[in-house]
């Protein structure tokens, strides 16, 4: 028994080449037509005999050329038919083989979720879908799909007895201010023979788009898959790049890459190399002519940033998307602290030199009220219920403002000497005040907070 390997496309190419030969023969035959009837050079017998001789040779060439052209046409036809026949035979032989393979894989796929022979499917990018496992006997694992923003990459599929593990999918980029998602783990190589899949790259950290807020950490690279008894472990995925920080915020460093996969057996190759950590995010700096001794800063629920300028008695408004100043609000004298109500969204600014608190409507960015408080109004904070607390630096007191009427309620609360900073616990509502001259912190409790105790620091 003998076997013949034929590539139909090569046969088709040979037929095309033979057709070009036939074209050349026809061209030569046409050129020789002029020699079949040669006129005698003179009217004598010798000239007539010579002309007859050349004409006879031309006629013989034409006859032979016609036969060659006919043979060539039949040869080209035979080659073309052979190419089609081989292609049909090849397709016919492939279909039964695929049918046999499908019949073998169907029950195994149904019972175990993976074929006996064949590669696993790749996960869909943008979904974090895991790659399919390769065939139990033979086949490579599918690659994991990349993650959507904030979603980890899919794990690579494992190989069976023989085959390579699939690569882990890349982690999705972090949402604003949040860490990038982790890369997917690489799939294990075949138990007997095969390399582990590489871990997926960690996602980049989310950008810190708001003034003073850092970007997210880069995502951790995926762990490389284990190699088979004979095979090399997959490389760990690279760590994601740290997210870019918001204006005047610290950058975030990238996270280290995933560990490389080790060998499963004593003969296995070396484990993969862990990925490098991502680069730190950049710091954005905003400059503007309206800035004059900027002092306090706060962010409202819509993301707009408010900066007090003590030297120009104004409040600058910054767009968080573009990090540019979009407005300047004329305020009281010596604006210092600024806070935003979590209930109403109103912005409260302390004016150190005029002993007042300005109320700013964030919808129009205009001052809608001025509330008299103690001497040297400096710090300001708002509790979860909406009450506003203002430190009066020269009065050594804290004023409490009712959000319903925007007026001071009750008597000022005595605290330590030279109160400056003030903050509210968002869970308990307890107010903390720093006193710079006696080195203490006053703790104010109650609703609204009234009871005071001081602790030395």
Swiss-Prot record:
This is PE-PGRS family protein PE_PGRS18. Its main location: secreted. The lineage of its organism: Bacteria, Bacillati, Actinomycetota, Actinomycetes, Mycobacteriales. It comes from Mycobacterium tuberculosis (strain ATCC 25618 / H37Rv). Keywords: Cell wall, Repeat, Secreted, Virulence. NHL repeats lie at residues 291-321, 333-363, 379-404, 419-447. The gene is PE_PGRS18. Belongs to the mycobacterial PE family. PGRS subfamily. Disulfide bonds: none annotated. Disruption phenotype: Invasion of the infant human brain microvascular endothelial-cell monolayer is significantly decreased in transposon mutant. One of its GO terms (cellular component) is extracellular region. PANTHER family: DIHYDRO-HEME D1 DEHYDROGENASE, PROTEIN NIRF. Enhances mycobacterial intracellular survival, probably via altering host macrophage cytokine profiling and attenuating the cell apoptosis. Could be required for host endothelial-cell invasion. Expression in Mycobacterium smegmatis, a nonpathogenic species naturally deficient in PE_PGRS genes, results in alteration of the production of host cytokines, including IL-6, IL-1beta, IL-10 and IL-12p40, as well as enhanced survival within macrophages largely via attenuating the apoptosis of macrophages. It is found in: Secreted, Cell wall. Pfam families: NHL, PE, PGRS. Residues 1-92 form the PE domain. Induction: Highly up-regulated during the early stages of invasion of the human blood-brain barrier.
